[in-house]
Design a protein with these regions (language model features):
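Residues forming the flavin
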Residues: 1-203
Length: 203
């Protein structure tokens, strides 16, 4: 999040790669590898409706994506947990305790606090980095109902002759939670189907 309010999409894949989330109090607050809708709701429930995404140098070394975030100035950094906490503006003792507790959880393969079951790596390789994040709408799943021919259905579930739809204006395609990247297939597949259906109807 930039000072002017503009923001950039940060991949959620970093959480699966070993990153953790802490709130503005320096504490973890949720299972980071839960579904995006649940994690987003948990972030919104935090002070300032935001969180910090924490990674270490070992993650940076393996990820051109993170290196790009650093180059773009999206991160704050510190040579120690205390220095990173200071750069983030959170309590140093609390954040350090959070990091130590997480590293112990990784070693034990057991997260007693939030039940996370994915432990890619401890965050022990200095320097450390944090990215300020907040949930934002970048895709909608609610909308008008279509059938397999991409025909728009009325309230009775009947196809409306000559009316077709595809993409984000439609609902029910992804269920309760969209998986990253699936929207591209949705647009392409139903876009093509709607075009074919419209062409067939025009014959």
């Amino acid at each position: 999040i930039e000072e002017d309010g503009n923001a950039h999409l940060i991949t959620e894949g970093l959480r699966g790669d070993g990153a953790i989330l802490v709130n503005t109090e320096g504490k973890r607050f949720y299972d980071e590898v839960s579904t995006r809708d649940k994690v987003s709701a948990a972030i919104i429930a935090q002070p300032e409706k935001s969180a910090w995404l924490i990674v270490d140098q070992s993650m940076v070394d393996k990820s051109a994506v993170i290196a790009g975030y650093i180059k773009s100035g999206y991160t704050v950094t510190g040579a120690t947990y205390e220095e990173l906490a200071k750069a983030m503006g959170v309590d140093e003792a609390t954040f350090t305790s959070t990091m130590n507790t997480w590293n112990q959880a990784v070693e034990a393969k057991s997260d007693a606090e939030f039940g996370r079951t994915s432990f890619a790596n401890p965050l022990t390789a200095a320097p450390y980095y944090a990215i300020k994040i907040t949930p934002a709408v970048h895709h909608t799943m609610g909308g008008i109902v279509i059938n397999p021919k991409a025909e728009v259905l009325n309230e009775k579930g009947e196809a409306i002759s000559g009316l077709y739809a595809a993409g984000e204006v439609t609902g029910g395609v992804h269920g309760a939670n969209r998986l990253g990247g699936n929207a591209v297939a949705d647009f392409v597949v139903f876009g093509r189907i709607s075009g074919q259906s419209a062409a067939d109807n025009a014959k």
